[in-house]
């Protein structure tokens, strides 16, 4: 399965713990080492120290719509995009709806292994 990773410098405003991009990449690499069925195609990263940074996030979304990969891996939902509305729109309503899966390591979500209702409930709980 072709997958990509996404990391960013700053989490959502309401999240207190801090993960560096290096720490996010380490967690993703460890997961990939255990899951040989996943083939990392590309790493997207918004490195600007700006809450609104989203150039890589937007490029990942566009590439996903074009089906350049099958799955996105992130260390934490709080580092999955610039804010919850953007993530919900891009991941849940756009990419997931077209068959792109999402693996969120910290929260233990793998949309390959759960029902659509469980995904809906997960995003609802993050609101």
Name what the model sees in each region:
Residues 1-127:
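Short, structured surface patches at the beginning of a domain
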């Amino acid at each position: 399965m072709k997958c990509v990773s996404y990391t960013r410098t700053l989490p959502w405003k309401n999240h207190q713990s801090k993960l560096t991009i290096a720490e996010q990449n380490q967690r993703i690499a460890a997961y990939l080492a255990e899951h040989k069925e996943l083939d990392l195609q590309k790493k997207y990263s918004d490195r600007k120290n700006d809450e609104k940074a989203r150039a890589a996030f937007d490029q990942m979304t566009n590439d996903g719509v074009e089906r350049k990969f099958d799955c996105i891996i992130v260390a934490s939902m709080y580092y999955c995009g610039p804010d919850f509305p953007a993530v919900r729109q891009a991941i849940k309503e756009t990419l997931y709806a077209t068959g792109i899966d999402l693996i969120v390591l910290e929260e233990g979500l793998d949309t390959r292994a759960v029902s659509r209702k469980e995904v809906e409930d997960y995003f609802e709980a993050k609101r």
